[in-house]
């Protein structure tokens, strides 16, 4: 047989760290889904604002927005 059993006593225990202790409560919620829409509307607003920001940057880059007092080549 190709499988091998390992006794529990021979396995090293994971080392506890301060960061691990701080992050453990966050990991305990893994796999749980809040009922309803949750924070989806906030994500939609953030995505819309980011799209507006990118379009403004693109318009400035393409010089399709006139900027008074700023010289461009």
From Swiss-Prot:
Q: Where are the transmembrane segments?
A: 41-61
One of the entry's Gene Ontology molecular-function terms is: phosphate ion binding
Sorted keywords for this record are: Chloroplast, Membrane, Phosphoprotein, Photosynthesis, Photosystem II, Plastid, Thylakoid, Transmembrane, Transmembrane helix
Query: What are the subcellular locations of this protein?
Result: Plastid, Chloroplast thylakoid membrane
Top-level taxon: Eukaryota
Q: Name one Pfam family in it.
A: PsbH
Annotated segments matching region Disordered: 1-23
BP-aspect Gene Ontology terms: photosynthesis; protein stabilization
GO CC annotations, alphabetized? chloroplast thylakoid membrane; photosystem II
The principal location of this protein is: plastid
Entry comment on modification after translation:
Phosphorylated in both bundle sheath and mesophyll cells, phosphorylation increases when cells are grown under high rather than low light regimes (70 vs 900 umol photons/m-2/s). Double phosphorylation in bundle sheath cells is only seen when cells are grown under high light regimes. Phosphorylation is a light-dependent reaction catalyzed by a membrane-bound kinase; phosphorylation occurs on Thr residue(s) in the N-terminus of the protein.
Membrane-protein topology: Single-pass membrane protein
Residues with the Phosphothreonine modification = 3, 5
Q: Briefly, what is this protein's role?
A: One of the components of the core complex of photosystem II (PSII), required for its stability and/or assembly. PSII is a light-driven water:plastoquinone oxidoreductase that uses light energy to abstract electrons from H(2)O, generating O(2) and a proton gradient subsequently used for ATP formation. It consists of a core antenna complex that captures photons, and an electron transfer chain that converts photonic excitation into a charge separation.
- Annotated family: Belongs to the PsbH family.
Subunit field text: PSII is composed of 1 copy each of membrane proteins PsbA, PsbB, PsbC, PsbD, PsbE, PsbF, PsbH, PsbI, PsbJ, PsbK, PsbL, PsbM, PsbT, PsbX, PsbY, PsbZ, Psb30/Ycf12, at least 3 peripheral proteins of the oxygen-evolving complex and a large number of cofactors. It forms dimeric complexes.
Please name the PANTHER family in this protein's record.
Answer: PHOTOSYSTEM II REACTION CENTER PROTEIN H (PTHR34469:SF4)
Designated name of the protein: Photosystem II reaction center protein H
This protein's gene is called psbH
